[in-house]
């Protein structure tokens, strides 16, 4: 009998949520997603030290004479993300998501500028922008930035998405793909209610993604829905049939080892028509987020967490730069 993973792959695009190249080789997904935390974890792996060194050297060459150490590290942050993305694209047939610096989440102009720069880095390697999804936090400013980028033909993946308002705002902006989170919503409800068991369709994260998916299909939105941030494989199975699901290697492994019948839970062909067309301007969006304690807290927490990961990656790069400079000094004495 086919594994649950094989069955899932026949009805949903399975995406690897990792920067670990070995895991991507093992599971051979169509697409892959990365974020600052995943890039940091991969960068800490001694197996990828050569890639880090290549990114540092490439950054040196791309900067004008007289650049500062801080300018070099800032440039290398972008290069590291692209170098990992390039290596991932060598292993998959589809797209990779590369995230804009989370510290720009409330700056539309800076986000647009950074996204264009990332795309140009990929272009320098001969990689078509059709294979790249620029990952941006689902703030109002992030959605507006993505709307600008989409009009330029730069496809975006709006992440840290925790409620219906964020999703609809993205769809109305004609964003290519959204990543509504599942597990982090579950975490919040567990902490607030003290209830530990939200089984199957009672899982609040599953309910959120299901609502978004059904509404998008009812209204004919082209924005793809990719469930993300899972805490167990039951959440994944409850969303079988979703456009895409991005899954961590440990859960891909579990799904690959499990057998049994997988039931398709989401189906775009069986949706009833809703009479309500939701629209959110900036005022409505901000009010909706303010009224949704879970979404507000989790969005803030996510941006803070990704920002800290970038800062830690900067420290790692500084340490490696110092090691390289010391090696060069020793070799010349």
UniProtKB/Swiss-Prot annotation:
Localization, per the record, is: Cytoplasm
A Pfam family name for this chain?
Answer: TAL_FSA
By its UniProt entry, which InterPro entries does this protein fall under?
Answer: Aldolase_TIM (IPR013785), TAL/FSA (IPR001585), Transaldolase_1 (IPR004730), Transaldolase_AS (IPR018225)
Please give the Gene Ontology molecular function terms for this protein: transaldolase activity
Biological process GO annotation list? carbohydrate metabolic process; pentose-phosphate shunt
In the Enzyme Commission scheme, what number(s) does this protein have? 2.2.1.2
Keywords, ordered alphabetically: Cytoplasm, Pentose shunt, Schiff base, Transferase
Tell me if Transferase is a UniProt keyword of this record.
yes
Please write the reaction equations for the catalytic activity of this protein: D-sedoheptulose 7-phosphate + D-glyceraldehyde 3-phosphate = D-erythrose 4-phosphate + beta-D-fructose 6-phosphate
| Record bears the keyword Cytoplasm | yes
UniProt pathway: Carbohydrate degradation; pentose phosphate pathway; D-glyceraldehyde 3-phosphate and beta-D-fructose 6-phosphate from D-ribose 5-phosphate and D-xylulose 5-phosphate (non-oxidative stage): step 2/3
Give the active-site positions.
135 (schiff-base intermediate with substrate)
Q: Hey, which family's this protein in?
A: Belongs to the transaldolase family. Type 1 subfamily.
Q: What does this protein do?
A: Transaldolase is important for the balance of metabolites in the pentose-phosphate pathway.
Family annotation (NCBIfam families): talAB
- What is the protein's name according to its record? Transaldolase
Q: Which organism is it from?
A: Prochlorococcus marinus subsp. pastoris (strain CCMP1986 / NIES-2087 / MED4)
Which gene holds the coding sequence for this protein?
A: tal
